[in-house]
Amino acid sequence: MTIKNLLRKNIAAIIEKKQSKKSIYPIRNIRLDSNENLFGSPLAANYHQQNGDLSFSISEKISRIKGVPTNNIFFGNGNYEICNALVSAFCEPRMDNILICPPTIEIFEQIADIQGVAVKKVLLINDYQLDIEGIAEAIDEGTKIIFLCSPNNPTANTITREDIEILLNNFDGLLVLDETYINYARQRSFWYEIKEYPNLVILQNFDIAWGLYALNVAMAFGSENAIEILQKISPERGVSKASFEIIERAIDNIDQINQWIKDTVMLRGFLARELQQINIIRKVYPSETNFLLVRFSIDVNIAHDYLLKNGIVVKNCHNEILCENCLRISVGTLQENEKLLKVLKTLTL
């Protein structure tokens, strides 16, 4: 199977005729082709220049960290841009559809709605796992993409590998797996399987574990065909040179990042155990992320407002399907977690 067969006809034609964005020039040259500012940048860095080979340099470093070849890596301006490109490439408006499994993040449905692509929904079951039979029944010839999050947001759990593999082996379309929180999970990433499954695209980013949320830079891992498609239909400018330079510095501090991940997991365990001891909390769901989904035995709106009154902001998930009476609570510093616990213990009805 080649995913190019799934492309919209007009997109396939664009990809066929479009040359690679990367041009090769001599090391020393006079660049009079890009309309850059001849005086340079008012900043110390050469921000008047285009990215040049910086994206390839970052690809090489990420390749060494993750063990994925550079031609299986793509960088985009956030998960939204990459997902938007994939829906544009594979889904014919008013004809095709995507499939999602709520509760999950909103961007998949939002992108489809904007592009006039129908959305099929199959709810999670049994501790927020996939309803494989329900998905099989919902899929039709117009289903081009299944979007999943593992670990999932807001439920915080990973999807079982066996279920994901069932979909990869039996679904003829594209499976996009958002692994934004995979750094905090015990389950290993699916990037090792991209050679085995040409219909798999994995999304990760530098937002959370890397601490670079402000940059809004994401990575896609997939087959060479998938990466070529993304390269040829994505915006010409792509990720900024300034963002790549910051990412490069962060990569040089990978040991610090890995330590922060370990510390977050430790604090997550502490917070989960302590929350479960509070009498107004019914359940703290197992987490493979940097947040906890917590179900309350009292009206969750009261708990949410009480925390807010005491200067603590959390996410109220009560109106999300299958998350009734739940708050999503990010793991904070030890001091922040202790204050949260102290405030919740003082909440009486």
Annotate each language-model stretch with its function.
Residues 1-64:
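N-terminal "arm"/small-domain region of PLP-dependent enzymes with the aminotransferase-like
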Residues 56-97, 115:
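Phosphate-binding glycine-rich loop
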Residues 113, 132-141, 154-175, 179-212:
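Active-site pre-lysine segment of PLP-dependent enzymes
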Residues 162, 309-310, 320-349:
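PLP-dependent enzyme catalytic core of the Aspartate aminotransferase-like
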Residues 265, 278-310:
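Conserved PLP-binding catalytic core of the aspartate aminotransferase-like
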